[in-house]
């Protein structure tokens, strides 16, 4: 039986909450489309502080894989198709239908552009599925490759080089998009370092925890320092906030390590709630943007007090998503929508 690692339960829940907060801050910016000057710059830097959610999910996904497996079978892939890819498609069908009604456009057009090409918030699942295939291939070659510092360094160079030229070289950018049919955010070269970082940390997990026990404060200082590096590299486009950026790679990576280190100190705090958020995190990720606009129409009245706005919005979103998930959980067939993790919850403990 796999050991339950409480710090990873807390970590997954916190990353889930961070992604919701990122989208809430985006809603505020979109509402004030005429924002400019100091207000726009301030919003830009605040939003980027919490932009590390998606990279952290990629790191965590591969960390869990190399932590829990030393070899895999073909079932490793089929399980992820059933409980990750199929929910992505089914929720994508619902999203595409609702968008076609909202925008009075073709359902087929919405489904192709959003779900198949990855031009929606669920693009992250397309990236993850590519990494599942890559992980399977590496397992079949040699599990110990996940422990390679050389591969880790090369992946960092590859990701940074790709993102730098993709951002700053118009010819390179246009050539890539000419031959790559999906959304640019799904190109794995822009995320490859996070994959190998998660793999390396999962392979050396106990050593990572020992390191964080001694040097967590140093990692926090490094996180602050790397964010100032990002500020120094900012190009003046204060509307575009994305984790698909070479200037944020060090910050995103170190923030994952910092949050993991902080989570090692949590044992029982809000544990029942944290356990539910963690178990339903995949479903929350897919569902919350669908309800976000409608909920924001109410919670934006608290916008002048940002912390109150975020707290109330986060509470309602988590409550609605988990509530819907708990009802669907009563029927085993809905594992193809909410995933399999919610079925591992011990409801009698609540």
From Swiss-Prot:
Subcellular location: Cell membrane
Zinc-finger listed as a keyword: no
Knockout-associated phenotype: Deletion of the icaADBCR genes leads to the inability to form biofilms, produce PIA or mediate N-acetylglucosaminyltransferase activity in vitro.
Spans through the membrane: 8-28, 40-60, 83-103, 119-139, 146-166, 182-202, 216-236, 254-274, 276-296, 308-328
Pfam families per record: Acyl_transf_3
Domain of life: Bacteria
GO cellular component: plasma membrane
Main localization of the protein described in the UniProt heading: membrane
Protein's membrane topology: Multi-pass membrane protein
Gene Ontology BP terms: enterobacterial common antigen biosynthetic process
Homology family: Belongs to the acyltransferase 3 family.
Record's protein name: Probable poly-beta-1,6-N-acetyl-D-glucosamine export protein
Lineage of the organism: Bacteria, Bacillati, Bacillota, Bacilli, Bacillales
